[in-house]
């Protein structure tokens, strides 16, 4: 048994395992994924009996954490061939990947779990619940200006997203031109696209959509006052109700139903890096110390002292006096 990181030219070797384990994914999507995403990601594998039997992929995303940009990794395609399961392969891959990311001082990693219980023992915790809404087809719609974006419109999409997302959350994915160039191709691989909505020539909304067995809309960004334009647009996608993922609260009045579903789990990696970018609200102060227990990334297992500065930033140091003890998982729930 050999655990190693593949060279980029070897990434295609994992496609066979992906097709076996994730058989619902279409050929069109995998063609896109293995042509685009595997050019920039990392793939860790375990080889045995001359073949790749287990894998874990790390896709890079530029995230904005408070005022600081970070390159963080999204864990995806954690898979083991059926006859090689229950041998601890996933655990070995996960621990190795986490240690490597810790060595790069990456603040945290994240994933969408197949089951919460798989990742809780590794101190992953849910930190984000996605608002999911169902929209009925609108009985009467108005004529609207709309088109599907091309890769050449990625700059326009990015500028619109930056304006809409700035200040809305302390942690979010940076949707720059590169993000949208890639996203256009991803949505096209799922028989969809990125729809641009306009009013009198002005861009008032964008959303991603996929039309496979069902129709789904993702990441809608709509200017205030143009909610019905969005409803008009998605009513033209399908005769059946449309599910909208990551639905903004402002669109809820138009929806038939809305629910929140736990979606993203986070695992803190390099704790000092993460703590150093935290801030306190204006007019507030912070002074505390606590011990952290991290059985996997033991470099985090120290006694940390946090003191806020006049500009709101937090000074992070080590101390010998602890006011309490936290597991790294419990700290994740507090920080996020």
Model-derived regions, located:
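Amide-forming acyltransferase catalytic core, primarily the GNAT-like/NAT-type
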Residues: 129-233, 248-250, 279-282
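Glycine-rich, histidine-containing beta strand-loop boundary motifs that form or position
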Residues: 112-115, 122-123
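Conserved acetyl-CoA binding element of GNAT-fold acetyltransferases
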Residues: 70-82, 213-224
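Short amphipathic alpha-helix that is part of the acyltransferase structural core
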Residues: 1-60, 67-74, 139-178, 212-215
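Conserved GNAT acetyl-CoA-binding A-motif
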Residues: 94, 100-113, 238-249
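Active-site/acyl-donor-binding loops of N-acyltransferases
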Residues: 123-142, 220-228, 232-336
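Conserved acetyl-CoA pyrophosphate-binding loop and the N-cap/start of the following alpha-helix
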Residues: 84-96, 225-233
């Amino acid at each position: 048994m050999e655990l190693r990181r593949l060279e980029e030219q070897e990434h295609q070797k994992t496609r066979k395992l992906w097709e076996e384990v994730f058989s619902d994914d279409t050929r069109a999507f995998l063609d896109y994924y293995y042509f685009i995403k595997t050019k920039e990601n990392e793939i860790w594998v375990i080889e045995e009996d001359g073949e790749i039997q287990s894998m874990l992929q790390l896709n890079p995303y530029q995230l904005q954490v408070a005022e600081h940009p970070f390159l963080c990794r999204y864990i995806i395609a954690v898979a083991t061939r059926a006859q090689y399961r229950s041998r601890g392969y996933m655990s070995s891959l996960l621990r190795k990947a986490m240690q490597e990311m810790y060595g790069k001082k990456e603040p945290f990693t994240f994933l969408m779990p197949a089951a919460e219980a798989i990742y809780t023992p590794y101190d992953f915790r849910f930190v984000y619940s996605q608002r999911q809404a169902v929209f009925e087809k609108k009985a009467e719609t108005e004529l609207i200006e709309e088109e599907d974006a091309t890769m050449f419109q990625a700059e326009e999409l990015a500028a619109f997203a930056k304006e809409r997302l700035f200040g809305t959350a302390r942690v979010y994915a940076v949707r720059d031109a590169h993000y949208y160039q890639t996203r256009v191709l991803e949505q096209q691989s799922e028989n969809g696209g990125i729809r641009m909505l306009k009013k009198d020539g002005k861009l008032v909304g964008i959303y991603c959509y996929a039309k496979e067995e069902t129709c789904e809309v993702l990441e809608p960004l709509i200017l205030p006052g143009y909610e019905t334009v969005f409803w008009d647009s998605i009513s033209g996608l399908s005769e059946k109700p449309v599910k909208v993922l990551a639905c903004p609260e402002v669109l809820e009045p138009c929806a038939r139903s809305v629910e929140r579903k736990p979606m993203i789990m986070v695992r803190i990696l390099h704790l000092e890096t993460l703590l150093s970018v935290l801030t306190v609200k204006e007019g507030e102060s912070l002074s505390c110390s606590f011990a952290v227990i991290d059985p996997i990334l033991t470099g985090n297992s120290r006694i940390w002292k946090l003191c806020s500065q006049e500009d709101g930033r937090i000074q992070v140091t080590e101390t010998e006096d602890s006011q309490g003890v936290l597991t790294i998982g419990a700290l994740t729930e507090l920080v996020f």
